[in-house]
Amino acid sequence: MTNFTTSTPHDALFKTFLTHPDTARDFMEIHLPKDLRELCDLDSLKLESASFVDEKLRALHSDILWSVKTREGDGYIYVVIEHQSREDIHMAFRLMRYSMAVM
């Protein structure tokens, strides 16, 4: 089993579970909007390297990147796990920064 370094044990637990294809597929079947589920072939999920995320960002969150076949071609599903113990008025900007790192 892969060991992950994270600031909270909750992040490590979710990241460990969501790096398993069957668990990730079940999670996405439950949580992705129907329109997106219908576009994606979740049986084609492939775990990708998240090494593109710089060390400063890596210290702030746990991230998982899955590639997936879609009706339109290849695509990606980026899972960001962020447990907050208090309100963060800048959360939307932080999530945007994480997403931009993937691009």
From Swiss-Prot:
Query: What superkingdom does the record give?
Result: Bacteria
Name the GO terms of the biological process aspect: single-species biofilm formation
Loss of this gene results in the following: Decreases biofilm formation.
Pfam families listed in its UniProt record: Transposase_31 (PF04754)
Q: PANTHER family in the record, alphabetically?
A: INACTIVE RECOMBINATION-PROMOTING NUCLEASE-LIKE PROTEIN RPNE-RELATED, PTHR34611
Q: What does this protein do?
A: This pseudogene is the N-terminal fragment of low activity DNA endonuclease RpnD which probably yields 3'-hydroxyl ends. The intact protein can be seen in this entry (AC B7NGZ6). Expression of the repaired protein increases the frequency of recA-independent recombination, but also decreases viability probably via DNA damage; in a RecA strain expression has no effect on viability but does induce the SOS repair response. May play a role in horizontal gene transfer.
Record family assignment: Belongs to the Rpn/YhgA-like nuclease family.
| Protein name as catalogued | Putative inactive recombination-promoting nuclease-like protein YjiP
